[in-house]
């Protein structure tokens, strides 16, 4: 089974085609369709939206006839929202009678899914494993049989796809073991010594970054669903109105958001299998305004390495 996160308004609806229309949702659905055709069975597909993009997302996919996917197996749900506060601890308002609310982080997907009753639906359907993936990586393989098989064969509670870092300072979290538990160390938590630490073979020790494509045992997700995930405080630019009703759209961070993170769900598992994939074939996130992951980025390679 699959769950997708559409964190930014209209992100999945973005047209990334060069010579023809090609939408991010279309790419992801095509990737799932590969497995559907091989398996000869439809896979339940759960798509998470925010309050702000729910109507746009559902209307867009309906208009596009779900890019050929069986509509009976596509289920939408809204992510839970959390308030923001300014640096003085004051709640920010979006309207005179409405708090400024934001999605509660990428760790909120399973609790949000359960609020819609989809946990019971999965139990009745006999779904044993659930893939959680981000909307922005258009090349990722979803429910890749090799990945699924490796995780099941390992006996682990979950698995995470990883890629070798492009360079030691790449801003990605690293899947490792901490006190016998699976742990993801975020790039901003790593010291310079950790970043450049090498093993006995001269390879970087913290060299495999997660790409936000995880496979979880559903019964383990159910077991941790009652536990509260820790809240992470994140500084963000949050539009708001002041006491006079004047709208403000800050250009620099002005507030704290409180988010749960999927990395804490991984930490709650007994074990996790890191599964390396080829970043040139399976990792193309579209998220940064400029730089390596931006939409207009072109590879310096003289040939297209991403050809299959």
State the predicted function of each range.
Residues 1-6, 86, 191-192, 233-236:
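Active-site-adjacent bridging/hinge elements
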Residues 1-5, 79, 277-279:
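Short loop/turn segments at strand-loop or loop-helix junctions that form parts
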Residues 3-11, 297-305:
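Conserved small/polar residues in nucleotide/adenosyl-binding loops
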Residues 9-10, 55-61, 87, 141-145, ...:
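A short acidic (Asp/Glu
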Residues 10-127:
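Conserved N-terminal catalytic core of the sugar/cofactor nucleotidyltransferase
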Residues 128-129, 139-143, 150, 154-299:
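Catalytic core of tubulin tyrosine ligase-like
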Residues 133-134:
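Active-site acidic Asp-centered loop
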């Amino acid at each position: 089974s699959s769950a997708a996160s559409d964190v930014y308004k209209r992100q999945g609806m973005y047209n990334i085609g060069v010579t023809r229309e090609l939408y991010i949702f279309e790419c992801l659905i095509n990737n799932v369709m590969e497995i559907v055709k091989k398996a000869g069975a439809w896979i339940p597909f759960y798509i998470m939206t925010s309050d702000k993009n729910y109507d746009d997302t559902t209307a867009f996919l309906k208009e596009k006839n779900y890019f050929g996917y069986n509509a009976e197996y596509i289920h939408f749900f809204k992510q839970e929202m959390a308030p923001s506060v300014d640096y003085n601890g004051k709640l920010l308002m979006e309207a005179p009678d409405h708090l400024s609310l934001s999605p509660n982080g990428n760790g909120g997907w399973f609790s949000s899914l359960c609020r819609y009753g989809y946990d019971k639906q999965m139990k009745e359907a006999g779904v044993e494993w659930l893939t959680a993936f981000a909307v922005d990586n258009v090349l990722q393989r979803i429910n890749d049989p090799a990945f699924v098989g490796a995780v099941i064969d390992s006996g682990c509670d979950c698995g995470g796809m990883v890629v070798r870092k492009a360079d030691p300072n790449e801003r990605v979290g690293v899947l490792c073991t901490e006190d016998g538990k699976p742990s993801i160390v975020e790039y901003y938590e790593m010291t310079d010594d950790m970043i450049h630490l090498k093993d006995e073979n001269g390879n970087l020790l913290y060299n495999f970054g997660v790409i936000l494509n995880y496979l979880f045992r559903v019964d383990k997700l159910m077991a941790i669903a009652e536990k509260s995930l820790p809240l992470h405080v994140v500084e963000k630019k949050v539009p708001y109105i002041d006491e006079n009703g004047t709208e403000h759209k800050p250009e620099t961070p002005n507030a704290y958001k409180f988010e749960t993170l999927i990395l804490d769900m991984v930490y709650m598992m007994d074990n996790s299998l890191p599964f390396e994939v080829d970043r040139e074939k399976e990792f193309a996130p579209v998220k940064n305004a400029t730089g390596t992951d931006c939409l207009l980025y072109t590879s310096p390679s003289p040939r297209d390495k991403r050809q299959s």
